[in-house]
Swiss-Prot record:
GO biological process, one term: pollen sperm cell differentiation
Tissue specificity: Mostly expressed in flowers, and, to a lower extent, in roots, seedlings, leaves and siliques (at protein level).
Keywords: Chromatin regulator, Cytoplasm, Developmental protein, Nucleus
Keyword Zinc attached: no
PANTHER family, per the entry: ACTIN (PTHR11937)
Induction: Before cytokinesis.
Entry protein name: Actin-related protein 4
GO cellular component, one term: nucleolus
Chain intervals for the UniProt region annotation (Disordered): 48-73
Comp. bias intervals (Basic and acidic residues): 60-70
Gene name of the encoded protein: ARP4
Subunit structure: Component of the SWR1 chromatin-remodeling complex and of the NuA4 histone acetyltransferase complex. Interacts with the SWI/SNF complex. Interacts with EAF1A and EAF1B.
Family: Belongs to the actin family. ARP4 subfamily.
UniProt xrefs under SUPFAM superfamilies: Actin-like ATPase domain
Amino acid sequence: MYGGDEVSAIVVDLGSHTCKAGYAGEDAPKAVFPSVIGAVDGVEAMDVDVDSTKTNSNSEDSKTESEKEKSKRKLYVGSQAMSYRRDHMEVLSPIKDGIVSDWDLVDNIWEHAFKSCLMIDPTEHPMLLAEPPLNTQQQREKAAELMFEKYKVPALFMAKNPVLTSFATGRATSLVVDCGGGSTTISPVHDGYVLQKAVVSSPLGGEFLTDCLLKSLESKGIKIRPRYSFKRKEVRAGEFQVEDVDIPDTTESYKLFCQRMIVGDIKDSICRVPDTPYDDKSYSNIPTTSYELPDGQTLEIGADRFKVPDVMFNPSIVQTIPGMEKYAEMIPSVRGLPHMVMESINKCDVDIRRELYSSILLAGGTSSMQQLKERLEKDLIEESPHSARVKVLASGNTTERRFSVWIGGSILASLGSFQQMWFSKSEYEEHGASYIQRKCP
């Protein structure tokens, strides 16, 4: 047991798109930055920023080739560092399909959150980490090991994302529809526990929709120029001339990262889910909406602002978007949002199905898309059993939807009754990392 009431806990929610970190008890995270890392290989380990070289005493000879490579790469983390273009900088993501694939990068993201953003000493604060519902035991143990061995935290707790979203809205039982950056996951929560067998997920998240919109715009001959690739000169008052700047050493991954930032903003600003399933005929002469790109050109976007969001409900639309052919094999196996919700509920015990239908919670950055709540509710009312009273709940505040997992963690870690739940450093030293399975079921 850990008795650390006098210092506030730190809550970290590392998503596939954004990392959120801050103090328990506050109503929003202090640090919010992209959970990707810029890496420049072959930099001599002498000029180190947030370098992946750790202070190990092992000699150069005992290092493997890949370790030597890693020790020569320089890493850049955070919104500011990532917005600056560097030659040969690749953009790497440590998370694949919601699960951590590169712990070295995660370590650097945590370090940035603690040292540069929150400016705290991790040895003085208990840590609450949010984790995906399908996280493996091996992943949890690795996280515990890093937290206790490297950051030397006094106590740790790992809580599942859907449970925290449920707590954020003051419920113990609900069906959480988490539309994140990398995937969409539907998880039933009953009395504060996730029903693992009924969790349903799909790879269609916010980033997939952003890519659909990017490809669709490019197929119409619209060039999305990243901010570093042009200069604007004022010719006359209010009139600008745009000149391309040729930068040959920019990597493809960094160019795409910058384009996704711009297209992501277009998506958030003007896209909305259509009230009825999308088809080209009914939306061909829809009024357009304008959006000004950073280089000054104004886009007029018509049908695409409805077509792209409808991919969430009808994934087969992807096959009609030029440039998205590589997903052709994946798409037939992916189900639309209403079907995923029903599939998840049908995997649960009959006794709780009614309660789940009446408390469907929307969470995640993509859930803030206009009309998503209304369309999901409408489709579910049409397709669900008559006895079910469908109610889709979503906070009217987009910040609360986007940060619901973090907010739930902030509430949980500041509860007086929660303080005996922490997995303490002394318990870790006595029982080892595998004890996390007992402390945080």
